[in-house]
Structure formats: C-alpha cells, structure tokens
Amino acid sequence: MENGTKNVEELVKNKGLLSPGGKALLKDNPDNYIKIRGARQNNLKNIDLDIPRDKLVVITGLSGSGKSSLAFDTIYAEGQRRYVESLSSYARMFLGVMDKPDFDTITGLSPAISIDQKSTSRNPRSTVATVTEVYDYLRLLFARVGVPHCPICHREVSKRSVEDIVNEVMKLPIGSKLMLLAPIVQQKKGEFLHISEQYLQKGFSRVRVDGVVYALDEFPTLEKQERHDIELVVDRFILNPELYSRISSSIEQALELGQGLIMLLKINDNSSTIEGKNLGKSNTEVLTYSQRYACPVHPDELIPELEPRLFSFNAPQGACPTCTGLGTRMEIDPNLVFNQNLTIAEGGIRPFNRVQSDSWWLKRLSAVAARYGFSIHVPIRELTEEQKHLILYGTGNEKYEVKISGSGKFKDGATYESIYEGVIPTLERRHKETDSDFMRKDIERFMRVHECQTCHGARLKPVVLAVTIHGLNINDFCNLDVDAMLDILSQDLEFTEAEALIARPILKVIRERVKFMQDVGLGYLELSRAANTLSGGEAQRIRLATQIGSGLQGVLYVLDEPSIGLHQRDNDKLIATLRHLRDLRNTVLVVEHDEDTMMSADYLVDIGPEAGARGGQVISAGTPEEIANDPESLTGKYLSGAKKIPIPKTRRKPKLNQYLTVVGARENNLKNLTVKFPLGVMTVVSGVSGSGKSTLVNEILANELLARLHRAQTVAGEHDRIDGIDNLDKCIVIDQSPIGRTPRSNPATYTGVFTAIRELFATQPEAEIRGYKAGRFSFNVKGGRCETCQGDGVNKIEMHFLPDVYVTCPTCHGKRYNREALEVKYKGKDISDVLNMTIDEAVEFFENIPAIANKLKTIQEVGLGYIRLGQSATTFSGGEAQRIKIATELSRRSTGKTLYILDEPTTGLHTDDVNRLLKILDRLVAGGNTMVIIEHNLHVIKSADWIIDMGPEGGQHGGQIIAEGTPEEIAKNDQTPTGVYLREFLK
C-alpha cells in the first residue's frame, strides 16, 4: 500500500467503504454515526471515519500507530471540550479547557466519558468502597439500622427515656443524699464569665466548677488556657418515694439544660453546707444518665447519635484520632537510620552522616557513649541492642556536659549542659515542626508506613467500630472481598419490620454495585483496599462498574484496554459488561488488542500501517469478520490465523541447575509459599486476577533483591528468606512507567547517547577553536541553550479563560539553542538537527561512530526506529517507554547474572508488537540472564521456558501455587484455568 492509497472501487464493492488512505465512510442514516473528517491530531493522516453509534466499537493497531490519538485525543477530547465550552467563563476557569483537537469536522458526538488507566486516585484516603460509593450506602445503612455497643464491655446499648432514668434513680437507697447536675461545659478552655449572669437570670443559684460547688454570684476566676468542667446544680434532695413528681420534673429540666446528659452526685458527706466543698471522687459517687446512647456499666463512654458522617474516616466525628482516618502512620524505621558497616564518627547514622567531627550533636553523642561505655569509633553492627536503643531513643532527662569550640551563640571553650533526645525523637519533632518541604521530604527518606497501633488499620474510632449489623461492624464489611460481600448480601438478613423498610432499598443499591464489580472480574478485591494500590487495569474496571451502576443512556464511553491485568477466564465477564453498557443505548469505544474483545465487537477499526510517522491511517474498518479477511490488515492476519507467533522449538533448562528460592512467602494472601525460580530461563508467573502474582514477584522478590543487590530503600513483603541470591549481581525491574516526567526528558538523554553526541560536537574544529566543552550543547544549562525559552523551544502564554497557548520561541525558532551553539556542525548538521532526526535517520548518520550507532541500533531493533531522538518523554505510550528501557538494557554489556522482572509487558502492545518483544526478551535470556514475567497474555505464556501458575481463585481464595512446569505440562493440567486456555495456543 503506497501512501495509504487503495483502489477505491474495490473498497466500495467489498466493504461499502471509501478509503483512499485514511477514510472509512458508511452509507447509511447519518444520524447513526459519529462522522470524523480530516483528523490530523498527532500522527493522524487527515483521516475520515464513520463510527456507528450505540455499538461496541474496538480501535486496534500497533503500539504508537495513533489509536489513542483518534479515540482519546480527538473524539473524547472534542466531546469533553464542547461540553465545557457550553459553560460560563467562570465555571470554565475551574474546570479548565481542553485544546481543540486538529480536525475539520466531527458530527454526531454524544457527551463523552473517558475511562482510562491514568486517572487512578492517588489519595491515601480513597478505598475501593469509597471510589465505588458503596461506602456511602454502608454508612447510611449503619446509621439507620446499626446496633450500638459499649466499646469497652461490648454490651448492647440503647437510648433511655426520661421515665427510664427516673425509675432508675428511684431504685437508689431511700435517704440517699443526691445532687442533680446538668453539664454545660465539658473539658473546654476559657474563663466562661457569662455563665454567672446567664443562669442567675434563669433562677439557678449554684454551680459546680472542676468538682467544687460555688454560689453563682461568687463564680470563680478561671485560667483561660486550662480545660474546665462546669455543671449547673438543678436540684438537691434526699431520696423519698413521695418526691417522684419533683424528681421527674427536675430530671427533665436537667436533660434539657445538659443536652440529653445529666449527672447525679450521691453525696457521702453529712454536713449541711456544700458551698466551697470539693465534691469529687473521695466523698461522692457520680452516676451519669443520658437520653443518648450510653452503657449502664460504663456511663462515661457516651455513644453519639448514629448519623452517616460518624462512620466516615474522612470526618473528625468518626476518624481515628491517632492516624486521622488513614489507618497508617509514617514512622521512623530504625533499619533505615543505621549503616551497620560504618562507625558513628564515619557517618553510620544516616540522617546525621554529614555532621562535622566538632559538631554539637556529635560531641553530645560522644558524651552519651562515654557514660554508657561504648565508642563512636566502632562499626554500629558491633554495638549491643541496648546501646543502639540509647542512640535511637535517647536517655530521657539525663544531662551531659559538652565542651564547645565555636562561635555565634556558643562561646569558645565554654561547657554546656544538655539532654540527649535520641535520633528518632529528634527526627519526629523536626518532621512535625518544620515548615520546609525539603526538610520534611529529607526526613521521610528514613520513614516507613506502619499500621496505626490505635485502630489497627480500621481508620475509625472504637465507639464507631462498636456499632454492628448481625455482629459485623462497618470495617468488617469493608474487609470482605467482593465475592464474600455478595454472599452475605444474598442471605436473608434479619431486621425488624421497621428496620427492613429502611434497609431494603439501601441493601439493593449496595448489592447492585458490588455485583457490577464482580461482573468486571474484581470479585477478589477487598472493599477496604486502598485505591492507590490498584493497578491501572483494576482502577479502570472499578470506574467501569461505577458507570454501569449509574445507568446513563446516550453517552459515548471511551475505554483504554480494559482487559489489562485480566485472566482469560474473566475476559468473558468483561465483554458481557461492555455489551451491557452498549445495550443501555450507549456508544462504547474501546482501544484494545485482546483478540476475544476484537472478535466480540460490532465494529472494528484497524489503525496503521506502522507506528509513529508511518502510522496514523485507517487501514481497515468493518466487522471483525471483514477485518480478518482483509489482506491489507496486519490485525486481520492475526485474527484469521494467517500470521502467528511461533511456539519455541525447545525449552531452556535451568542454568547449572540453579534456582532462586523464595521461602515462607506470607505477604497479603500468600499461603506460606516456597517458590523456586529457575535461573537462566524465562519464567512466566500466571494465574487469575488477585491470585498473588504481584505480591510474590514485586513485593517480595523484586523488593528484597533491590535492597540486597543495590542497597535500595525498598521493603520486602513478609517472608523467611530468599536462597540463591549469590548467583545474581543485578536485578532490573522494567515497567511501563514514563522514561521521564518532564518534556525535557527524551530518548537521547534516557539512553545516555546524548552524552556521546555532545562530546562528539565538542571535538569539532569550530568548538575547539571557541573552547566549547560538551556542556555547551546541553539545553538544560546556561551556556549553549536559548535563554529566551530556557531550552524548551516554546514559550507558554497564559490565556486565563482559554487554554494556555504554546508559541514557538521567536529567538531560537524552536531549536532550543543559541546562535553560537548552532554554528558548530557535524557533517553539515547542528545539534538541533540531530535531535530532530528519527532513530532510523540517526543510525545512518552516525554509522561511523560505534559509541553512538550501537546504542541507537538497539532502539531500532525494538521497533522504535520511527521515534525522534529529542522527542519529549511525555508523548510516549507505556509500551514505547518500556521498549526504550529494554533497548537501554540491550545496549549494556551483559554479565549473564542479571535478573529482569517485567510486570505485564504486553500492556498496550499489538500481537505483532508482542512477537517483536518476545524476540528481544529471548536475546536477553540467551546471554545467560534470568527473566521473570507476570503475564496473562497467552502468546507470552506459551513462549516461556517455565510457568508458575497461581490460584486457584483471587483474594483470600488464592495465594497458592496450583501448577508448575513447561507450557506443555501446564496445558495438560485440568486443575488450572491457565492450562485450559493454553491448550488452544499450543496447537
């Protein structure tokens, strides 16, 4: 196909399409289509496309071909932009305005909702329950039909009426000397000068302040900064059955004054006067009664009115006061404080490793060491645990004499007395008191997140957790996984008739929302799971379930690979969910590579033919069957079976029969596993979603190896040990995170080739004459860069109510460098020209410079010859970023003792990209290295040398190894879902 052109007549005849290079037009009722004309966003080649409305439409193509440019950057962006444009300028100021995509016309657009993987909540307060709004309904349920209990003795409590309280008082011994009090101030700071006048006018004469009774006209002077208790004396009487009416009236009045709370003092003092007396615990017995919830055994443990906000860990009424509702606390970790191999004098205490030998801090610690008999000149590992504890936590109020030679506030030669606070209390105090973000982040290097010791991760106050429904509190419900929650909700929960009327509609909504989560393959997730620990695929499917629950119609949904992280077994549920969304009369537009999803689509659009500048065209559009029969479509060839990823002819055996063995893995849902990873081969860890793959590989294996081999400050999940680490010298985790967070990062800087290019330019005659060094050719520092745009090539202009506009720098015209730097040339090209070259062009240009050409060739080999050397890192897809990382590893000299860990490397990759990726990974393993891959893609699984399959289910029903062996051995195993699906791929 030349320049994307096709025989128009043939296309019209075969498909009813008009497609000269980038057109797919359908002749039907125009109201039934989203009509796109002249789309040129990013790499799109002026394409025309008709997308049927109210259908499940899949857009596919190679990584970087322009799928997201069409689906998200054009269709969704324009739908969102039109909605926001319709709002007032004031509203637009808060919402922000999206740039208008580059196209001629788009008609037939509906309101658009994007469900991608990038908008996952990073808020530590967000959980699966809050994101899906299930928690809102649980809070309402507990507030309306929850049964409160005493948080101390756990007995059920209920409200008391005035009559109940009076009857209880009348049961006291006849002749008891009683004083009835109404609390009006409880543990509050202030002078409370208004109380005397306010209550004298109402006819009261006495008040008890901090346990002492005063006449109201002799109200004491109170300390403003201290907390006080003040109770109004409502009545005094000696208990007699004949006083029932008076006592009842007084109690009713006291309850009104005390806002539902009263105190009854049973006075043991026989004197007639009470003014000025301290009526405290020594001579009185205090009885507390409440119209609110209160325990008869522990009346001081008052339970507030049950309302929804009480059950929120984001509200002060319900949140645990220690962790403020987070369930965790940042605490200094002693293991991160010490460098066990160094002495204190050499900097063995990491937070203070830069202090001078004559510093106040070190001299004070030397005084501590002298008193407790240890030296600051021996390695920390040789100190006793008691001595380390002294260093970490201090020595209390003990004082030490420290002689200082200094200036400023310290007099030279003077001796000062000081306590030694300890490393951890010092860091905690500074972290709390500092206003400097830099200092706070610096201290946080030595902190780790630990479970809150007050609420033990429950996030709520004890009084809230004491409210139950059928024996379960709200945290117990949230600790259930979705499947278990559905099991409980499907039972007939017993309520009174009145409670059932309230609970039934709430339970119905909860049941529906939880069922939608199960339908998208998330049955293993616990509702209390923090949202910031979810993978992109999990977060996307949660949002998908939430959208289904909304029941909207006539909406355009745009999804980005919802099948990511989903086992083939759960894929059918996801497809059924997408169809359900479509059946609600919505248009569902999905960017996807999964073959089952493509074959289930109503309409399929194939973008290509290649990636980057060589992509951006509609190669084929139609039903999946039509695409499969189109010889021009690369996707069609894989769908029809005309093209396949070959099965390896042989499977590698472990190198020298060596293994990396994880012993006693118990983190999260792992069931005390011992797992052997063979060295020198490609191992795939497979299994249903939530079975424990990421916990085993990422949280235990990767974190432990990074800490042991690279001294990274990573914390491995709970396990006993890992054997065989001595057979490795490096552990490299290759994920799909960006290669840089700013537009200044690019492939040239990430791979390190830009250093060699700058050094090459510095050796050119013109550069040597002018005395230019390599730094002159950096756009990040002063010297060679354009100072007008500071090396960006563009200037940002703020437009307030309109989107920010980026205009080409008028000084350098987008070249990033000043005139002097651009006057230095190599083979007729300046440094800016080189950055604008594609990798393919650069390989040819630098063919005689091996230090540059060899690194560039590895990028070319991973299929990224189309990207530009200076292309911004923020423009790359996850698949492209990962392949740049793999190329960087390929260009390094292999030791044959490296472990590579990849987590779902096929994310965002077309089947043809997967084929290319497997060849690259095979090269890394062929050098004697070890590869461990977490993957659901059956093409990768069938290409492995060894498979570790986990299950049998997700969540608490997972965490076990259910099968190990070669792909052929796994395929014969009927007990594993992976094996059942793998059989078809091995035929």
Residue ranges and their predicted role:
Residues 1-987:
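Conserved phosphate-binding elements of NTP-dependent enzyme cores
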